[in-house]
């Protein structure tokens, strides 16, 4: 019997289930818990602990532990266990938890090569995070693996538990993320109408709110502590232990009106030598006030998802709550009341995602490379002198199915056919054999139901046919449509302007396959150090596409082929697939060199887009400054409440201290910057004409103050003529304006790039901005080469060094960052 496995790899807890097509089974931890804390603890002897033991010890000895690393998946943030001098990646940590959970399975399931495993990821996960999860599964030694979005898995769990038609909303609030899914069920078939969520919203944020707003103020009032308490490494263990105590108090408030955050001894003294302890009364009312903002954020996410689906609350029958924090009644009541939708607790909130993942795993064609879904249509060719075949629905969600006769030849008069169940002995009786004849069969059990077809001649004698066996799988539910959670595109340059060619748009049904053609923007010679870069971005910002989040770079390097040259303008044929999970697969062929480059090999790299959030405070500060300057410029001419919202997001982001090393705090700040960018993009879209005028005026002012003196007379005249052309484009609402503007900016850059002193200034800035470079060693080597070039007055070499620095720099989305653009063009 085949078994299918589902793993909910959670921020706080993980769970694993199996499904054999009929029955679900949850595998408990050795401690007999339904879920296993996603925690690793390594003692001073190097022994590893997982689960509850690891989580409890992590509170007392945080430098020996790794927790909540799921939030850092897809980034270059190291997970440091300083006490044992071990540094792990988030992928390595996740691999340990996957290996642990997979080990709960019986040996016959683990070692069966046919076992397929679905690992769930939040809908808000981007391509880098999904790739990191697949890497973790490979490290864990799990065989056949596919990813699935957590809200889809939750929907499958709901469908397994309760039949019935209608629209329902899944509110999946876990330890780290919020996922919202809206689904419609009709006769056992379910369509996802829309999904949304918040990447950094979960139980961990509730814990941190208690720590920041109750515990820290109490400590500062009670004891003599330094002003830099939050970032002072001396107090790291104390604060981690306090956070654990806050979390335990939060859990107790699910069943009590009042509790105490208590730690009799935190093994730390204050500046006056007094022993530090915790003894803080907290009420349910206190907690409600602290988490109100996050609950409001989750309610707004649900409303936005309803809007995406084109639905009102009146169209939705119930909210199904999933995830540990939804145990809290105040949260459930508040969400249901604000949305005016009835609350439901029909699934186990702690295990629903793992259960649904196992059910979904049964629907995957594990023999296919793309891990697509099994076909819902079945057919057999019985052959013979009748050219006989039978068509049927191979995977119905209900208890009945029809088998249809297809005749290609002439049938003998009086011929009949019959269908028997090999499971129950049921028989249909004989029915006249003719094209289009049908027999309805009963599916007696979930999973595979096997039938055999018999054919008889006019005298009742058996007629030999070829294939006569039909297997129909009665499924728990059938997913008709999975919408894409985001828009994903490839950046191209068009007349100097960056544009996105979309592979998939938000809410497009998945999976999606297609073919796109591009051209090389520059030549690439075999074995050279250069590359052609397909920059993959996620988002809907169209006028300034580099404001969209970069999620990876597919690079064809000169070292990837041994002979020939890809000439500028050469055709690049890109076959792509966006899978059910939202993962992107790219294969690029280059006819001119007969080359083929596939993303599942070494050519797809996440490194260019990853951030180390343990060392990102300077980068965040720079991003905040850039976006704030843009917002201030727009606010001088336009009054829009979204600008105030964007500034509020930036204020939150700018509160990160310059020496902040907590990855979660830094990542939340960067997410706030991304939200501010989206709000600004919305304002630009709604006020396109005045925004265009501002952009043109700014570009002209820059030319007049910084560039005109360096320009040749013909260049200045040409620039002025192009300005007039751009102005006419604004006045006539022409779509060519952005092309003209980018050409103007490009001319500014080209003139400045000729000036040696400008190149030196740019080099000095890049040499100092170490936080903008993931590969610090390569950055240092290039800086050394640049300094040597300056000493030798070799400015052409310096220009080459600056170009290389830009190519490995984390893109800030700055319009003046002209060297950071992709180098492929439209076909």
Question: Could you say what each language-model-derived stretch is?
Answer:
Residues 1-75, 79, 87, 107-827:
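Oxyanion-binding/catalytic loops of NTP- or PPi-dependent enzymes
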Residues 87-96:
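Conserved AMP-binding/adenylate-forming core of the ANL superfamily
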Residues 98, 106-107:
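Non-catalytic, mostly N-terminal accessory regions of nucleic-acid modification and defense proteins
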